[in-house]
Amino acid sequence: MAGIIFDDMFSVKSVDPDGKKFDRVSRYFCDAESFKMELIIDINSQIYPLKQNDKFRLVLATTLREDGLADEGEYDPKAEYPRIKQYEYVMYGKVYRLEDDDSGTDGGQLAAYASFGGLLMRLKGEAINLHGFEVDMNLYLLMKKTDF
């Protein structure tokens, strides 16, 4: 689908390992199944609770439009996006930092940091899997729990 810059299945390895900081937010540490990526993400656990060993699909996209065109830049309550209906949890945010491991080797590690209204995400793995990320780009996060 157009506009998707990352798509993989993740498994929750731990929940709030450093203790719970906020009443309605949990920090999840997850591992990807296909691309060997590490994900740390804050999620409103009151709206979308996850527990250890839960599996979910994570999609990161630059637009919700199926045709891949950029969004209008303002909220339209009449707009219908079929992409949203396929997922259970959706957030909108911005990439605020990209960080490499400075090892100087080909295919090194890269970490992309994004904020979704203060809920933070770090996605880390091989740089080739994060080539579509840029600092200050707008980003949609879409999640759906899976059974397998």
UniProtKB/Swiss-Prot annotation:
GO CC terms, sorted: RNA polymerase I complex; RNA polymerase II, core complex; RNA polymerase III complex
Record key words, sorted: DNA-binding, DNA-directed RNA polymerase, Nucleus, Transcription
One example of a Gene Ontology biological process annotation: DNA-templated transcription
GO molecular function: DNA binding; DNA-directed RNA polymerase activity
Record has Transcription as a keyword: yes
Main location: nucleus
Domain of life, source organism: Eukaryota
Keyword Transcription carried by entry: yes
Location in the cell: Nucleus
Region ranges (Non-specific ssDNA binding): 16-40
Family: Belongs to the eukaryotic RPB8 RNA polymerase subunit family.
Protein purpose: DNA-dependent RNA polymerase catalyzes the transcription of DNA into RNA using the four ribonucleoside triphosphates as substrates. Common component of RNA polymerases I, II and III which synthesize ribosomal RNA precursors, mRNA precursors and many functional non-coding RNAs, and small RNAs, such as 5S rRNA and tRNAs, respectively.
Record text on subunit structure and interactions: Component of the RNA polymerase I (Pol I), RNA polymerase II (Pol II) and RNA polymerase III (Pol III) complexes consisting of at least 13, 12 and 17 subunits, respectively. Directly interacts with POLR2A.
UniProt-recorded name of the protein: Probable DNA-directed RNA polymerases I, II, and III subunit RPABC3
Species lineage: Eukaryota, Metazoa, Ecdysozoa, Nematoda, Chromadorea
